[in-house]
From Swiss-Prot:
Lineage: Bacteria, Pseudomonadati, Pseudomonadota, Alphaproteobacteria, Rickettsiales
Protein's job: Catalyzes the reduction of the glycolytic intermediate dihydroxyacetone phosphate (DHAP) to sn-glycerol 3-phosphate (G3P), the key precursor for phospholipid synthesis.
Family of this protein: Belongs to the NAD-dependent glycerol-3-phosphate dehydrogenase family.
Record InterPro entries: 6-PGluconate_DH-like_C_sf, 6PGD_dom2, G3P_DH_NAD-dep, G3P_DH_NAD-dep_C, G3P_DH_NAD-dep_N, NAD(P)-bd_dom_sf
Gene3D superfamilies referenced in this protein's UniProt entry, alphabetically: N-(1-d-carboxylethyl)-l-norvaline Dehydrogenase, domain 2 (1.10.1040.10), NAD(P)-binding Rossmann-like Domain (3.40.50.720)
Species annotation: Rickettsia prowazekii (strain Madrid E)
Protein name (Swiss-Prot/TrEMBL): Glycerol-3-phosphate dehydrogenase [NAD(P)+]
Listed EC numbers: 1.1.1.94
Keywords: Cytoplasm, Lipid biosynthesis, Lipid metabolism, NAD, NADP, Nucleotide-binding, Oxidoreductase, Phospholipid biosynthesis, Phospholipid metabolism
Name of one Pfam family that matches: NAD_Gly3P_dh_N
GO molecular function: glycerol-3-phosphate dehydrogenase [NAD(P)+] activity; NAD binding
Amino acid sequence: MNKFKNIAVYGGGSFGTSLASLVARNCNNVTLFLRDEIILKEILYKKTNAQYLGDIELPTNLQATTNLSVIKDFELIIIAVPSYAFDDSIKLLKTYGISKEHTILVATKGLADNPTELFSDRLNTLLPDNPIGFLSGPNLAKELAKNLPASASIASLDIDIANKIAYNFSSKTFSTNTTIDIVTLQIAGALKNIFAIKSGIDLAREQGANSRATLIVGALKEITTLSKVLGGMQKNSDILLEAGVLGDLVLTCYSLGSRNTKFGYEFEISRDKKKFLCEYKELVEGREALKLVLDLIKKYNLHMPIVAEVASLILI
């Protein structure tokens, strides 16, 4: 199978930089697109991104630029921006010449808003003719950048596209699986951060290891519930057991390196919870996703008790 000859990664944060670093080990022509000129110079001349990844050394062949006019020259474009920036990012890239010839890989996790829908549905409107893929897995950014062992699921309605993308990522330290179940992979990516908040709360309450394991079971059930009504989990899909669902869920819920687990823990130990919520400045993806997931629960009249409990605690 042929690899993509050149790859662009749009998003110069910790995850975008780590993904660019990962694929640069498999592909000679990888460019990270970012906005910050200071970080750009650091990546080009020092091969580090200290603001997001400390002193981790990036591959020598990794290139970087702030010049979006050349992004149209890349075959595969990886989107690695926060969920709130997804729409604006796609619209911006369209003005720089993205055409139906470009394959888009979405590494952003969450849901689109106004209206609430999957990123795949939003892309049906914004980029209806492009080959689209989704990537998700237990991928802490600093560990990826260090080339430590990890894995991911890659989903596309066209399994050949998923396999081609996987071929660019797979290595001795990074394993992949592919699926056509784009719905479940996206739902898991949005919900796992909500479950991680619950995990942090339970940790602060000293609920014990049994409780946290039970949370994983309940989380998988709620992922299945929402996925099925949106068209996922068809044809005996086994995606639940793969890196992009179970793997990512376990990592996010069990690691205090997860912003969402950390948020849940700090929320629970805070004395003044309203003040804590008002003053908490760090981005918490689960907090943002929660409001959108509640829209879907209401729309489809679903029973998702873990999501409901987290909402009752932090949406005050």
